[in-house]
Amino acid sequence: NVEYLRMDMSANDLTVIPCDCAICINAILTGSLEKRINFFQSLSLCINAGGELVLVVPSLESKLYTQIIADRWNVDDAENDELPKGKEATQKISNIRQGVTDIDNVPTKHYLKEELELLLSLEGFEVSLVKKINYGWGTEFHKPPKWLKGPYPWDWMVTARKIN
């Protein structure tokens, strides 16, 4: 039997019924460290030992790669982007140190591959697979150059088994 449950896994007072499988696609995106910690702890609580997790999250490596391309070849007029100043600059520096970068002006958590492996292992998961899920340049740029091919931007997909 399959049952679909939609819930805020980052809530402080979450009540979960353990299951055998969880699929989380772009679900752990909050800029809040506290909410991300809650989310990963809730994942651990809601999956039975031996259960499977499929997780898809934005890649920090891909975000940086995309930014390097934008800056180097002035994609979408990147050279005219205004640099933040004062408190905004301080906040952006603090965010990037945690892998939080803006998507459409919304602070969004992006993950390193090794970071995901560590976070999941600390919550009792054994990572089975980490794979790049590629997507087109049109998701990153309004006007991607015609010459721009692969490697393409990507999200991370992780499969993991709950071991304890």
Regions found by a protein language model. Give the residues of each.
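Conserved SAM-binding strand-loop segment of SAM-dependent methyltransferases
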Residues: N1-A11
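A short acidic, Gly/Pro-enriched loop at the edge of an enzyme's catalytic core
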Residues: N12-A22
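A short SAM/SAH-binding and catalytic strip from SAM-dependent methyltransferases
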Residues: D20-K35
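Acceptor-substrate binding/catalytic loop of class I
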Residues: G31, L55, V100-E115
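A short glycine-rich, Lys/Arg-flanked "PGG" loop and its adjoining helix->strand segment in the class I
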Residues: I37-E52
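Conserved class I S-adenosyl-L-methionine
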Residues: E52-G86
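Short alpha-helix
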Residues: V106-G124, L129-V130
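Core SAM-dependent methyltransferase catalytic element
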Residues: E123, H142-N164
